[in-house]
UniProtKB/Swiss-Prot annotation:
It comes from Geotalea uraniireducens (strain Rf4). It comes from the Bacteria. InterPro entries: Elp3/MiaA/NifB-like_rSAM, Methylthiotransferase, Methylthiotransferase_CS, Methylthiotransferase_N, Methylthiotransferase_N_sf, MiaB_methiolase, rSAM, rSAM_horseshoe. Binds 2 [4Fe-4S] clusters. One cluster is coordinated with 3 cysteines and an exchangeable S-adenosyl-L-methionine. Catalyzes the methylthiolation of N6-(dimethylallyl)adenosine (i(6)A), leading to the formation of 2-methylthio-N6-(dimethylallyl)adenosine (ms(2)i(6)A) at position 37 in tRNAs that read codons beginning with uridine. Residues 378-440 form the TRAM domain. It catalyses: N(6)-dimethylallyladenosine(37) in tRNA + (sulfur carrier)-SH + AH2 + 2 S-adenosyl-L-methionine = 2-methylsulfanyl-N(6)-dimethylallyladenosine(37) in tRNA + (sulfur carrier)-H + 5'-deoxyadenosine + L-methionine + A + S-adenosyl-L-homocysteine + 2 H(+). Belongs to the methylthiotransferase family. MiaB subfamily. Its main location: cytoplasm. It is found in: Cytoplasm. It is an enzyme of class 2 (transferase). This is tRNA-2-methylthio-N(6)-dimethylallyladenosine synthase.
Length: 440
């Protein structure tokens, strides 16, 4: 009997990459590769990569060095790299990494089965061409998994904002929206398999449908998804603050299934830095959107992204960022030290902030956010929250779930409750999660 072939798939970076990895796994299952958690047992290793920051890119190259030894022990193993590093480097990756077999870009996932078949015959190939056609976003097997209660659904890909620091437009391409009929069909299929929560994904979901003649708007898409039986919660990410309209804000008050959480990246609280970043809004405009959002939905939980040490950022600029964080009261912030990215406008900016200063500012920012997060989590103690139970917690004998506001809750529960939304009394607020008890 022939042994089934094994796939080890490692994902770096954002939720879009997580979604892409799910597609990769489904495609490769179609040609006989099944997942393993042990890379040493794999016949095929795929790294789905991120290049949004230099540190993420360095991590990929470090992993490729580690796989050189595995390739030596198992010469027949196939090693592939996809995602944003692959899109950025293309043929150079094959030239610089002799033990690499396949390079495929962000627009070429659907070609992966034939690339693997070619690699099985000893060929080394790179496919990184952009395909400006929405049909490529639907060239994937139907998701037939019955595990998990929460899924990602890609609604669009690409970005045309060209923030001065950001490589995404260069590695994900121009904005392309999927057909709404295909999106709704995918969500209906997921609902039929027991999925209760979907997260609609795009680099800038606000732009959904704007370039597609006759296609519905993102707001209309949200409303259509909310009508699908079985889907009890809807999330979306990411929104660009300059496009965050009042009609979209109103959806948080008008669509009961839309979760009370929004990820709205500010990147900085300084108008001078925001202008240099080409963000397209001011501090005042951002805070105005936050105020309107809180007025429409007082229970909204807000997360964001912050970059520290952008070229020319002064101590005064940094203090403006800290004061913005205090005013918004983010429940979490993803914060990063600025790093130059190839092809971006900011890569040519002078007035670099020193590395020690960057690190010091990041530490101060993290200290502030930890305080705000802990205060926020403690404020939930004594309240009853609706929690979607997702699975077993790493804490022995407990399960975990999320509130509508995206706070993780650990609690004693029964496996029969996985996939159910239950009322939970919050008994403790910790730094990274909440502790609760089922309301009987």
């Amino acid at each position: 009997m022939t042994r089934e072939k094994l796939l080890y798939l490692e994902t770096f970076g954002c939720q879009m990459n997580v979604s892409d990895s799910e597609k990769i796994a489904a495609l490769l299952k179609g040609i006989g590769y099944f997942p393993t958690q042990d890379s040493s047992q794999a016949d095929l290793v795929i790294l789905n990569t991120c290049s949004v920051r230099a540190k993420a890119e360095e991590k990929v190259y470090n992993h490729l060095v580690q796989y050189k030894g595995l390739k030596r022990k198992k010469p027949g193993i196939i090693l592939g790299v996809g995602g944003c590093v692959a899109q950025q480097e293309g043929e150079r990756l094959l030239a610089n990494v002799p033990h690499l077999d396949i390079v495929f870009g962000t627009h070429n996932l659907h070609l992966l089965p034939e690339l693997v078949r070619a690699a099985e015959k000893g060929e080394r190939l790179a496919e990184v061409g952009f395909i400006d056609n929405e049909t490529r976003l639907d060239l994937f097997p139907v998701d037939e998994r019955t595990d998990g209660v929460s899924r990602f659904v890609t609604v669009m890909q690409g970005c045309e904002n060209f923030c001065s620091y950001c490589i995404v437009p260069y590695v994900r391409g121009r904005e392309i929206s999927r057909r709404s009929a295909d999106i709704l069909g995918e969500v209906r299929g997921m609902a039929g398999n027991g999925v209760k929560e979907v997260t609609l994904l795009g680099q800038n979901v606000n732009s959904y449908g704007l370039k597609s003649s006759g296609e519905m708007s993102f707001i209309a898409l949200l409303r259509e998804v909310s009508l699908i039986p079985g889907i009890e919660r809807i999330r979306f990410t990411t929104s660009h603050p300059k496009d965050f309209s009042q009609p979209l804000i109103d959806c948080f008050a008008e669509i009961p299934k839309l979760c009370r959480h929004i990820h709205l990246p500010a990147q900085s609280g300084s108008n001078a830095v925001l202008a240099a970043m080409n963000r397209g809004y001011t501090r005042e405009e951002y805070l105005g959107s936050i105020a309107r959002l809180k007025a429409a939905c007082p229970s909204i939980q807000i997360t964001g992204d912050i970059i520290v040490g952008f070229p020319g950022e002064t101590e005064e600029d940094f203090q403006a960022t800290l004061s913005l964080m205090e005013e918004v009261r983010y429940t979490d912030v993803f914060s990063f030290i600025y790093s130059k990215r190839p092809e971006t406008k900011a890569a040519g900016y002078a007035d670099e902030v020193g590395q020690d200063e960057k690190q010091g500012r990041l530490s101060r920012l993290l200290d502030l956010q930890r305080r705000i997060t802990l205060e926020t989590n403690k404020s939930f103690v004594g309240t009853v929250q609706q929690v979607l139970i997702e699975g077993e917690s790493r804490r022995g004998g407990q399960f975990y779930g999320r509130t509508s506001g995206n706070r993780v809750v650990n609690l004693a529960a029964d496996v029969s409750l996985v996939g159910s939304i239950v009322n939970v009394m919050i008994t403790r607020g910790d730094q990274n999660s909440l502790q609760g008890e089922l309301c009987r």
